[in-house]
Design a protein with these regions (language model features):
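C-terminal catalytic subdomain
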Residues: 175-181
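Helix-loop-helix junctions that connect adjacent transmembrane helices in secondary transporters/permeases
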Residues: 112-113, 117-143
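Conserved small/polar residues in nucleotide/adenosyl-binding loops
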Residues: 193-199
């Protein structure tokens, strides 16, 4: 073994520095989480109820990784944004925070949701094992623009818009007939937010 002290000689790290591209999009810590929240509150919360449905608009908080890692709490957000924007937008944003908490509650009490079908009729479903289809989905090469855009965004940034997540998940299961657990494994591997909990609910 090389005793020069050069850790690179141990070949412990991947040759492709995947984390570098994530650092262009994310900074960690409470300070940055609060800055991102305030930017959303002042620029994206108004119009949230309708705007959140359109991936190209800025009516999304992109706070999921910061909430996941405890850099900002739902309580801080809940009590800070009241009265700063139209009530319908604040209320809808609060409902999304509530849905997130409900998702964690479900997984805490029913951990089997991460590995088993809720509807047992699907236990014998003949899922496809087509590796080419799976790879095309993972890399964003399906030929369906909205699916490919979402999967490429996930790969490049570790994040995907909520509405697009629903589309790509539905495409994997209903169109490609690939087991949802395979898709969940991919999301957990490349998502900055580790989506197991919110996605399952």
């Amino acid at each position: 073994m090389d005793s020069s002290g050069d850790i690179s000689s141990l070949n412990l790290l991947p040759k492709h520095h995947w984390k570098d591209k994530l650092e262009k999009h994310w900074r960690i810590g409470e300070k940055f989480a609060m800055e991102k929240y305030i930017h959303f509150r002042d620029n994206g919360l108004t119009g949230y109820k309708e705007g959140r449905n359109f991936p190209a608009q800025e009516n999304v908080s992109v706070l999921s990784p910061h909430l996941h890692f405890g850099e900002i709490s739902p309580h801080q957000i809940w009590f800070d944004d009241k009265g700063v924007c139209p009530e319908k937008d604040v209320a809808h944003f609060h409902s999304e925070l509530g849905w997130r908490e409900f998702s964690y509650y479900l997984i805490y009490h029913f951990p089997f949701m991460c590995t088993e079908n809720l509807n047992k009729r699907f236990d014998k479903f003949p899922w496809s094992t087509n590796h080419d289809f799976l790879l095309a989905w993972q890399k964003g090469n399906t030929g369906y623009p909205i699916v490919d855009a979402g999967m490429r965004q996930l790969w490049q940034t570790g994040y995907m818009h909520n509405r697009v997540r629903m589309i790509v998940a539905s495409f994997l299961v209903k169109n490609l007939l690939i087991d949802w657990r395979v898709g969940m494994e991919w999301f957990n591997a490349v998502s900055y937010t580790h989506l197991t909990l919110p996605t399952n609910a």
